[in-house]
């Protein structure tokens, strides 16, 4: 299958360049690999860096492609994810407005907050680690938002 071949070929090249990289990570699921492979190189590098830091900081989280983008969940509740926008990669924390952190901007009408990146150099590892810790500790119940007819309740 073409996707399998493309993943293997790209992985060979990426493995060579990542061996010495700060962002080197464990193998990712094939659907997330395919998501990264569909991006231009610069955006793929940003997503690789985010993937690595998120999986290291939240090893207990389940992650998968959800609504066509990589998303991490704790006990079924979406916590963090990223996706390609027209001019950047957006990192989204579902409960991020409650973190009260500089560098995260309000997104939408619920509790989400975002950071946007156009280069991997813009990712501040210390800020990201702090935000990821808060994403575990501060959560709004998005898992049951439909059941509660759009009303969010704090779970942590």
Feature annotation, model-predicted:
Residues 2-5, 23:
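Tryptophan (W) side chains
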Residues 15-156:
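Charge-dense, helix-prone N-terminal extensions
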């Amino acid at each position: 299958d073409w996707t399998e071949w493309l993943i293997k070929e790209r992985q060979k090249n990426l493995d060579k360049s990542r061996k010495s990289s700060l962002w080197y990570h464990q193998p990712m699921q094939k659907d997330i690999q395919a998501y990264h492979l569909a991006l231009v190189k610069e955006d793929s590098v940003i997503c690789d860096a985010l993937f690595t830091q998120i999986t290291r900081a939240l090893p207990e989280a389940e992650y998968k492609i959800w609504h066509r983008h990589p998303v991490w969940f704790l006990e079924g509740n979406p916590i963090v994810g990223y996706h390609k926008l027209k001019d950047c990669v957006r990192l989204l924390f579902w409960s991020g407005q409650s973190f009260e952190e500089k560098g995260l901007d309000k997104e939408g009408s619920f509790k989400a907050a975002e950071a946007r990146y156009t280069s991997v150099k813009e990712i501040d590892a210390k800020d990201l680690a702090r935000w990821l810790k808060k994403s575990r500790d501060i959560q709004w119940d998005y898992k049951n938002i439909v059941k509660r007819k759009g009303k969010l309740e704090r779970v942590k």
